[in-house]
């Protein structure tokens, strides 16, 4: 069995096993502990996994399963490709980043990320600025923070990520229902819950990924 570990995210210390397919076809997802932290991992035969659509989807699916496995679990997500030479190497990384990880867990405790895209016909037949202002106002009081994402097509009117408290999730869902009813001629894409990808900033050195000196 390979010793390499692919890492999806960090949670509060917990023994966790998930029956979900991981990156590179991994059949088991489990945790590696360091003090009060647990890394969600699976076995992999490389420390430099190729970024494919299939594996990016698997990475995201695992993180969503971690969130679903127990209501109100907080996850610090890792970006795709974080693989380590051994459990010992991973624990060393957790030791070095422990303060930052603990701070981030505290900052995002009890929250999830929700994505909202609104698409129109891509012309001037809809009042884009009015829609942007109205929807932003409706969702602002139900979220802790928000980020503007790229409007990568002329059809996009809104592309935002919202940081939402677990306790306001139902109210946020209802607000999206109201937006869909008000703008039934537009396409509303509502995704999540996700770990707060757009609201964390954790960096782990490449030399640590490969095992260091």
Swiss-Prot record:
GO CC, any one term: gas vesicle
Recorded phenotype for the gene knockout or disruption: No gas vesicles are made, gvpA1 is still transcribed.
Impact upon substituting residue 65 to A: Few, long, thin gas vesicles
Pfam families noted in UniProt: GvpL_GvpF
UniProtKB keywords: Cytoplasm, Gas vesicle, Plasmid
Induction: Part of a gvpF1-gvpG1-gvpH1-gvpI1-gvpJ1-gvpK1-gvpL1-gvpM1 operon, maximally expressed in early to mid log phase. Detected at very low levels in growing cells, at slightly higher levels in stationary phase (at protein level). Not detected in isolated gas vesicles. Gas vesicles appear earlier when grown in static culture, possibly due to O(2)-limitation.
Major place of residence: other
Domain of life: Archaea
Subunit annotation: Binds GvpA1 in early growth stages; is the only one of GvpF1 to GvpM1 that interacts with GvpA1 in H.volcanii experiments. GvpF to GvpM interact with each other in vitro, and may form multi-subunit complex(es). Interacts with GvpC1 and GvpO1.
UniProt record similarity statement: Belongs to the gas vesicle GvpF/GvpL family.
Name of the molecule in the record: Gas vesicle protein F1
